[in-house]
Swiss-Prot record:
GO cellular component terms listed in the entry, alphabetical order: cytoplasm
GO molecular function (one): zinc ion binding
Binding residue positions for Zn(2+): H126, H130, H136
PROSITE patterns associated with the record: UPF0054 (PS01306)
Main location: cytoplasm
Keywords: Cytoplasm, Endonuclease, Hydrolase, Metal-binding, Nuclease, Ribosome biogenesis, rRNA processing, Zinc
Encoding gene (name): ybeY
Cofactor(s) named in the record: Zn(2+)
Enzyme class: hydrolase
Cited NCBIfam families: rRNA maturation RNase YbeY
Organism: Laribacter hongkongensis (strain HLHK9)
SUPFAM superfamilies attached to this UniProt entry: Metalloproteases ('zincins'), catalytic domain
Name under which the protein is recorded: Endoribonuclease YbeY
Biological function: Single strand-specific metallo-endoribonuclease involved in late-stage 70S ribosome quality control and in maturation of the 3' terminus of the 16S rRNA.
Length: 166
């Protein structure tokens, strides 16, 4: 089910963001919100980026999570770097896709007492950091990634997303 597709080009030479809303849900961020969050996560990068951002339902989120991660449940965010493992080549864009499962994001925000848009901002930044090579497989990596997310979100005017959980 494809509901709406928006191509947002805030700075054509720097960011080509294709937003694909595949679910009708209340409280979804606007394309300009996603563009601001993606742009903040890219701050300081000199190479351009081509990003696909897909907002999906639980069924599609579960299918993708099972297919690519071997986990048979929907998750909040998935990231797919199209040039993963390749060296950054001058002039070539960072390319990848971020998938957000709207129902999972809304449920988590409610359960954790978080503002829905703040949670979308956090997960969008989290996904963008994965596309740029950040990970959280070890405690050290997780701490570094969480710290970077917190700094980026603070610049956007959001509180520490981990303060609620710790």
């Amino acid at each position: 089910m494809k509901l709406a597709k928006t191509r947002f080009r805030p700075a054509p030479r720097e960011l080509d963001l294709n937003i694909d809303y595949r679910v009708a849900a209340t409280g979804l961020p606007r394309p300009s919100d996603f563009a601001r969050w993606v742009g903040a996560a890219l701050q300081g990068r000199s190479r351009p980026a081509q990003i696909g951002l897909h907002v999906v339902d639980n069924a599609e989120g579960q299918r993708l999570n099972a297919e690519y991660r071997g986990k048979d449940s929907a998750t909040n965010v998935l990231s797919f770097a199209l040039n993963e493992g390749e060296e950054a080549v001058a002039g070539l864009p960072l390319m990848g896709d971020i998938v957000l499962a709207a129902e999972v994001v809304a449920r988590e925000a409610a359960e954790q007492g978080k503002d829905l848009h703040a949670h979308y901002a956090h997960l969008t930044v989290h996904g963008m950091l994965h596309l740029q090579g950040h990970d959280h497989e070890t405690d050290t990596e997780a701490e570094a990634m969480e710290a970077l997310e917190t700094v980026i979100l603070a610049r956007l005017g959001y509180t520490d997303p981990y303060a609620v959980e710790h």
